[in-house]
């Protein structure tokens, strides 16, 4: 049996540095039997944020890249296809999606994708079937 995966999006990697919440620990508590993953295109988006911004965003993107490259997270070699947006690709590859992006959460729920998100800047909530 294949293990279930939580796909972490770009803005969710920024949560620890915006709200001082350990997303890895919280996701592992909320979804203990799930593997934490992120697609390579999310890593590339974080690299772009680091390269093209200054100040806090640049620092947070750098820290998010270090977190994404930690041993707890598997980076999947998944590419964008046919001018696909990052959000469209995340919806294509996710059964459980960790995001704080309001529009992406709505689109995911409409497609029946379970969403993990930060609530009250303190803890992670799971919305959908697990």
Where are these regions (language model features)?
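Nuclease catalytic cores that cleave nucleic-acid phosphodiester bonds
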Residues: 41-130
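Domain-level signal for Mg2+-assisted phosphodiester chemistry and nucleotide/NA-binding surfaces
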Residues: 1-71
């Amino acid at each position: 049996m294949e293990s279930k995966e939580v796909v972490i999006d770009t803005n969710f990697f920024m949560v620890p540095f915006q709200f001082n919440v350990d997303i890895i620990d919280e996701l592992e508590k909320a979804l203990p039997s799930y593997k934490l993953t992120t697609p390579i295109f999310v890593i590339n988006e974080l690299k772009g944020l680091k390269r093209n911004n200054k100040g806090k965003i640049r620092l947070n993107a750098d820290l998010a890249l270090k977190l994404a490259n930690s041993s707890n997270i598997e980076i999947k070699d998944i590419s964008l296809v046919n001018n696909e947006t990052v959000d469209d690709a995340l919806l294509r590859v996710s059964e459980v999606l960790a995001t704080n992006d309001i529009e992406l959460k709505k689109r995911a729920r409409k497609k029946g994708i379970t969403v993990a998100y930060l609530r009250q800047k303190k803890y992670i909530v799971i919305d959908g079937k697990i």
